[in-house]
């Protein structure tokens, strides 16, 4: 398979010069021999020791494994969780340099913190995120801001190369070519009530997602989460 970015004239000139790139070689007997095989993921519950006095933690999963359908409203919920609840609880109260929740398309939901002085307090606050979202009562201006920030990210102009990468990803992932537009429409139509209805699923994600940590030895040792500790420096 090949991907090309350019005008129709450049496209024709490219193939005239490149030939078939060997893409037609073989009779199918070797099909799949050199294919990338991704192993089935499993939770190793690992904490990797690095030279640091802080940590970087993530709790993430593929929501499809939990039977959760991630629509555009999830992006708005991610903004609300990141810039309201998690910011106040983990950044302000907990002292982490940064934190957030992301809903990347339909295939990843993730809590994360970085430059975090402690593991367990942040995990506990992640586990309470769904409860907070379930009682979410924003004022109109704040809620509109969450929506605008989501949609503006989708509407930002991109250069041809970036657009090609986006389309390649859509094709290789087997996504609907119109999924991006549909997701944008769902963002604009999101309501506070719809976000509240996601609270129970956020609680499930926090409870059932694997956790991985990179951090200093002392920070990891203070955690009671029972990590399998891996020393990256031997």
Write out the residue ranges for each language-model feature:
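A generic structural signal for well-ordered alpha-helical segments enriched in polar/charged residues
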Residues: 20, 128-135, 197, 201
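Short amphipathic alpha-helices in soluble, non-transmembrane regions
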Residues: 14-21, 124-129, 226-227
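M16 family metallopeptidases and their MPP-like homologs
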Residues: 1-5, 56-77, 85-192, 207-215
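His/Glu-based metal-binding/catalytic segments typifying zinc-dependent metallopeptidases
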Residues: 5-6, 10-91, 231-234
């Amino acid at each position: 398979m090949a991907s090309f970015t350019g005008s129709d004239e450049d496209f024709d000139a490219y193939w005239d010069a490149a030939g078939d790139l060997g893409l037609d070689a073989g009779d199918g007997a070797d099909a799949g021999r050199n294919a990338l095989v991704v192993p089935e993921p499993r939770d190793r519950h690992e904490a990797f020791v690095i030279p640091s006095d802080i940590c970087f933690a993530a709790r993430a999963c593929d929501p499809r494994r939990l039977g959760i359908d991630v629509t555009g409203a999830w992006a708005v919920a991610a903004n609300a969780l990141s810039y309201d609840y998690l910011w106040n609880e983990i950044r302000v109260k907990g002292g982490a340099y940064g934190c957030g929740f992301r809903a990347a398309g339909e295939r990843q939901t993730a809590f994360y913190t970085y430059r975090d002085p402690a593991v367990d307090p942040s995990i506990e606050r992640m586990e309470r995120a769904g409860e907070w979202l379930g009682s979410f009562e924003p004022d109109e201006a704040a809620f509109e801001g969450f929506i605008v920030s989501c949609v503006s990210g989708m509407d930002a102009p991109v250069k041809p190369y970036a657009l090609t990468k986006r389309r390649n990803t859509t094709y290789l992932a087997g996504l609907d070519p119109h999924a991006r537009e549909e997701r944008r429409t769902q963002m604009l139509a999101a309501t506070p009530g719809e976000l509240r209805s996601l609270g129970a699923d956020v609680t499930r994600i926090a409870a059932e997602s694997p956790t991985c940590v990179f951090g200093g030895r002392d920070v990891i040792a203070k955690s009671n989460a029972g990590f399998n500790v891996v020393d990256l420096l031997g």
